């Protein structure tokens, strides 16, 4: 009928068949969790895993992080063979550790070593949240403490990139002890004139944020990083108040004086280079044996 000509027609979208979907290999495309844009993974990797549309910083693994800041081929790893055991006989802990080792090809949640940034020697530690959510157990604490001691021995700056859910519950009090161990190592290093740069990435929470992550001479963070001790819900229930939407973000902490700078990932290497250049040789005269 004539009136049918003026009826708004329904719009339809073609849904790709399973066969079409299978034609795109896994890993070729990546969807941004913030803006939902789908992009080529190689394009994302080229931009240091920062979304080209909205600037969201996707998580980096330890090796990607090291490659992004150190001179090519300069990294030498420390304590690679150190692995966690199960001192408290926590159920299924060994199995979970083994699964993470296979999945990440790491022995623990932190990689430590030395390398150069524009030919300036540094000791560096990078946490990897893929391994037990970057949680700090006995081995993580020991590796970080040893790295700090190595920086003290070499009289060079120490840089750490944190990404952690906090202390590792499967190791109980032994895990909590690492907060004190790492902090004491850094205090000794600081008293001797050492330069410590802490870079907090998403997420840095719990016992890690409450210990070594916040002790830097320079405390930096990546945009949008979640940084805090207790979870948002726990705090709201405790204080019985609604918290700001941007609470515990890097930008919130910067605004309230708890960070020195929020640094875009594409500018991180250059920012570190400038800090090192400013302090190069300066602290050596005050080192105490």
Swiss-Prot record:
**The protein's name:** Acetyl-coenzyme A carboxylase carboxyl transferase subunit beta
Q: Which UniProt keywords apply?
A: ATP-binding, Cytoplasm, Fatty acid biosynthesis, Fatty acid metabolism, Lipid biosynthesis, Lipid metabolism, Metal-binding, Nucleotide-binding, Transferase, Zinc, Zinc-finger
Biochemical pathway = Lipid metabolism; malonyl-CoA biosynthesis; malonyl-CoA from acetyl-CoA: step 1/1
A Pfam match = Zn_ribbon_ACC
Extent of the signal sequence: none
Annotated CoA carboxyltransferase N-terminal domain residues: 28-289
Give cofactor(s), names only.
Answer: Zn(2+)
What this protein is reported to do is described as: Component of the acetyl coenzyme A carboxylase (ACC) complex. Biotin carboxylase (BC) catalyzes the carboxylation of biotin on its carrier protein (BCCP) and then the CO(2) group is transferred by the transcarboxylase to acetyl-CoA to form malonyl-CoA.
UniProt keyword annotation of Lipid biosynthesis present: yes
Q: Which segments does the entry list as coiled coil? A: none
Residues that bind Zn(2+), according to the entry? 32, 35, 51, 54
Identify the InterPro entries for this entry.
Answer: AcCoA_carboxyl_beta, Acetyl_CoA_COase_Trfase_b_su, ClpP/crotonase-like_dom_sf, COA_CT_N, Znf-ACC
| Cellular compartment(s) | Cytoplasm
Catalysed reactions, semicolon-separated: N(6)-carboxybiotinyl-L-lysyl-[protein] + acetyl-CoA = N(6)-biotinyl-L-lysyl-[protein] + malonyl-CoA
Cofactor descriptive note: Binds 1 zinc ion per subunit.
Q: Which GO terms describe its molecular function?
A: acetyl-CoA carboxylase activity; ATP binding; carboxyl- or carbamoyltransferase activity; zinc ion binding
Enzyme Commission code: 2.1.3.15
- Describe its assembly: Acetyl-CoA carboxylase is a heterohexamer composed of biotin carboxyl carrier protein (AccB), biotin carboxylase (AccC) and two subunits each of ACCase subunit alpha (AccA) and ACCase subunit beta (AccD).
Gene Ontology cellular-component terms for this entry are: acetyl-CoA carboxylase complex
Keyword tRNA-binding (UniProt): no
């Amino acid at each position: 009928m004539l009136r049918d000509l003026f009826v708004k027609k329904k719009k339809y979208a073609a849904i790709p068949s399973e066969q079409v979907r299978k034609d795109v290999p896994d890993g070729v495309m990546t969807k941004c969790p913030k803006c939902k844009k789908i992009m080529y993974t190689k394009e994302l990797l080229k931009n240091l895993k920062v979304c080209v549309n909205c600037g969201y910083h996707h998580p980096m693994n330890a090796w990607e992080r090291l490659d992004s800041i150190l001179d090519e081929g300069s990294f030498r790893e420390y304590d690679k063979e150190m692995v966690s055991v199960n001192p408290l006989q926590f159920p299924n802990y060994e199995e979970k550790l083994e699964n993470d080792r296979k999945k990440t090809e790491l022995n623990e949640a932190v990689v430590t070593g030395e390398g150069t940034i524009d030919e300036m020697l540094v000791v560096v530690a990078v946490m990897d949240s893929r391994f037990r959510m970057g949680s700090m157990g006995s081995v993580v604490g020991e590796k970080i403490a040893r790295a700090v001691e190595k920086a003290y021995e070499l009289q060079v700056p120490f840089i750490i990139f944190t990404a952690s859910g906090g202390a590792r519950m499967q190791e109980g009090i032994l895990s909590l002890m690492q907060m004190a161990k790492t902090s004491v190592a850094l205090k000794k290093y600081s008293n001797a004139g050492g330069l410590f740069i802490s870079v907090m990435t998403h997420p840095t929470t719990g016992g890690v944020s409450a210990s070594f992550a916040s002790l830097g001479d320079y405390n930096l963070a990546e945009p949008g990083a979640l940084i805090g001790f207790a979870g948002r819900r726990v705090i709201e229930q405790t204080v019985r108040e609604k918290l700001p939407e941007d609470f515990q973000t890097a930008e919130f902490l910067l605004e309230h004086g708890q960070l020195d700078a929020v640094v875009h990932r594409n500018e991180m290497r250059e920012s570190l280079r400038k800090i090192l250049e400013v302090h190069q040789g300066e602290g050596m005269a005050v080192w105490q044996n």
